[in-house]
Amino acid sequence: MDEKVYGYMDWPRIEAIVYGEETAPRDVMGPRITQDGVLIQGFFPDAEEVSVISGKKTYACEKEDEAGYFAVLLPVRKVPEYRFLIKMGETETECYDPYAFPCQITEEEEKAFCAGVYYEAYKKLGAHPVEIKGVKGTLFAVWAPNAVSVNIAGDFNGWIGRATIMHRMPMSGIFELFVPGVEAGTHYKYEIKVKGGEVLLKADPYGNSADHDPEGASVVADVSAFQWNDGDWMKERHRFDDRKQPVSIYETSLEEWKSAEELVEFLAEEDFTHVELHPVMEYLDDITGGYSTYAYYAPTSRFGSVADFQKLVDALHQAGVGVILDWTPAQFPRYASGLEKFDGTPLYERQNPAEAIHPFWGTLLYNYGSPMVKDFLISNACFWAEVYHADGLRMDDVDAMLYLDYGRNPGEWTPNIYGTNENLDALEFLKHLNSVIKERNPGLLLVAQENGLWPELTDSVENDHLGFDYKWSGGWTKDLLEYLSKDPIERKNYHDQLTMSMLYAYCEHYILTLGSRDVGTLKDFADKLPGSEEQKNAQIREAYAYMMLHPGCKMMAPDKDMPKELEVFVKDLNNMYLAHPALYQLDDEYDGFEWVQLMKYEENVIAFMRKTEKPEETVLAVCNFAAIPYENYNVGVPFAGKYKEIFNSDDKKYGGNGVVNTRVKAAKKAECDEREYSITLKLPALGVAVFTCTPEETEKKPAAEHSQIKKSITKTRTVRKAAGKTKAAVKTAVKPVTKKVTKEAPQIVNKTEEKIPVKKDLTEKK
């Protein structure tokens, strides 16, 4: 044994390395300049022989400990470039020394992390393929402040974690290490030794890819390699900060689509402005529908690779469709390899075990008082916006975040310092999150699903509120579906459920939803409604049309395999919405809506106007929720002029009976609804008729109506330049990333030859 080498051995530290308790291996292993040369040490548990190759020379290492600790003293004064040559049996492997590379996380980044303001934590924590000093490898970093030690186990080292010991940063408790030669596609986990000696095998919280099998191993992925083609879209995304833009969202699950191409073509053809996708982040149990997120920084591998999901978003943007992702920052699942007691202590979850468990799902609730947990979640939101170009996040289960007593009985929760039930840490976190997102990503939509009636949820953080852009209008959906579930004969007794929404329509910025959670499939929707199959279909069309006309953004989820008639209906509905500024420009202002007929409960009819500052842009909507049509129905109008029907849910091309108004209506000077002028129209059973209102003095436009609509659609969607791409062009932009999970779609239209009775006397009762 070389006495000089032996004399440099730090035996207590070597013992800590051998027994898996060393937290600063870079201080011991790697190169170190001494008065006798450059000392190089390494730990290779299963190696028979180890040498150091430097230039054209090879230096044999001595085994200083039988556990596999090797060292050599090079007769040089400066640290040279070198590699290890490791012999195991007949196999020889060359590798660079991971401890020859300095820490890649700066002191400033570490301080920001400890303060809860490291919004780009996703760039350093996790596993990132990088090149340092001409050497390619992967930078690993994980936060585990209470761990005794942390190792990396994976494909690259035969899952022997004790051979790859991570270095602890003392201020933050981040363990980091650059491992040369590790490439994208490598599977890995962290071996975390906790107090008491137990070793936990954990997936990477910041990992960019993961398996969805029960083991849930993390996978090294390069999320920066993709070449985006949506520059025009990203430059214009800030426009959605202006709430005067139309927002029509199609909610869908990725598993419903055979390919990305199919989804992109459908959305572009149907003229939706946005799509809300789920499930996106990796999850393990299919039964959860993707709402028990396992890997927050990884798109689920069920439907393709990291690059495949980036291609999907890129193609959607090129087709003029914004992308909203479902996000679950309220709770996380309890998996042995997940976030629960990540380093042997409650790190991500609330400290009190009794209050850490979600009362309904049995999952764990986040500790929003921890700066590092805030880093994890805020950085995650920034990650999806900045790395995957997401245009919005829909936050699930916000109630569980806001209320300490959510789902709990007295005695099962602890009040805050003021003796109330608000989660003060969660409130601060949400304000912090929304402020950061708005500053870094103007135009990104933050949507809350919250049913606890938290006041002014969508008011600004500057006004000391939470700063969401929108919240789901659960009250509107509940009232409408309850009303529609009644037999039309009984609906007059529930008329206020139809009209009540306008009493609170301006309390928040709402998204009206008839999504999968609300109505399920089309068959499920039909099962909620009374009447014959034809009447059910008519009511589905009426519900969608009423939603599109009511103040608020829109979200729907009709089956992708919907009947052709309904597909045409949805496209025309979106076209009408996009073409008429009155249907969206003043959604949040009282001046944008005016009742015409509010109390026609005997007839089951409501009528209202949607308006802008220009009278000629006024739209009149008349909705009949009775099972019988009205042949000569009088409606008061705002002024003398022409009233042209631009949409009717009973049109035969939609599967209706054709009770429509083909001729332009001239307002007559006959008082109705306390208005000087009125029109008489045909009103279909269980249907909606929509009219444009042109004042008498307004000059007739020279262009055709069809041309006007198309121009208006183009104007409201200025960055949707690729919406008219050919199918061939779309095919070149994407490749299949989804699997097909088909469900038999119900036949939504079933015409009959039976004549529909026309009710002429409005005073007569059915």
What does each of the following model-derived ranges do?
Residues 1-35, 59-144, 169-251, 657-662:
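The feature marks proteins involved in alpha-glucan
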Residues 28-46, 136-139, 146, 597-636, ...:
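Carbohydrate-binding surface patches
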Residues 389-391, 406-558, 578-635, 639-650, ...:
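Conserved alpha/beta catalytic core and glycan-binding cleft of carbohydrate-active enzymes
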